[in-house]
Amino acid sequence: NGWNDNKNFVLFGAAAWIGLVLLVGTLYYFVV
């Protein structure tokens, strides 16, 4: 169960990073 929780945490972290990169990239695209 500990591994499953850790895996979910890693997936959530990866999704958060991808969302952040897309958000910054979109803002940068519109500004520039």
From Swiss-Prot:
Gene Ontology biological process terms in this record: photosynthesis; photosystem II stabilization
InterPro entries for this protein: PSII_PsbZ, PSII_PsbZ_sf
Keyword field contains Lyase: no
Cellular localization per UniProt: Plastid, Chloroplast thylakoid membrane
Transmembrane segments: 12-32
Main location: plastid
Gene Ontology CC terms, in alphabetical order: chloroplast thylakoid membrane; photosystem II reaction center
Keywords: Chloroplast, Membrane, Photosynthesis, Photosystem II, Plastid, Reaction center, Thylakoid, Transmembrane, Transmembrane helix
UniProt superkingdom: Eukaryota
Membrane topology category: Single-pass membrane protein
Subunit structure, as described in the record: PSII is composed of 1 copy each of membrane proteins PsbA, PsbB, PsbC, PsbD, PsbE, PsbF, PsbH, PsbI, PsbJ, PsbK, PsbL, PsbM, PsbT, PsbY, PsbZ, Psb30/Ycf12, at least 3 peripheral proteins of the oxygen-evolving complex and a large number of cofactors. It forms dimeric complexes.
Role summary: May control the interaction of photosystem II (PSII) cores with the light-harvesting antenna, regulates electron flow through the 2 photosystem reaction centers. PSII is a light-driven water plastoquinone oxidoreductase, using light energy to abstract electrons from H(2)O, generating a proton gradient subsequently used for ATP formation.
Family: Belongs to the PsbZ family.
Record protein name field: Photosystem II reaction center protein Z
Annotated organism of origin: Euglena granulata
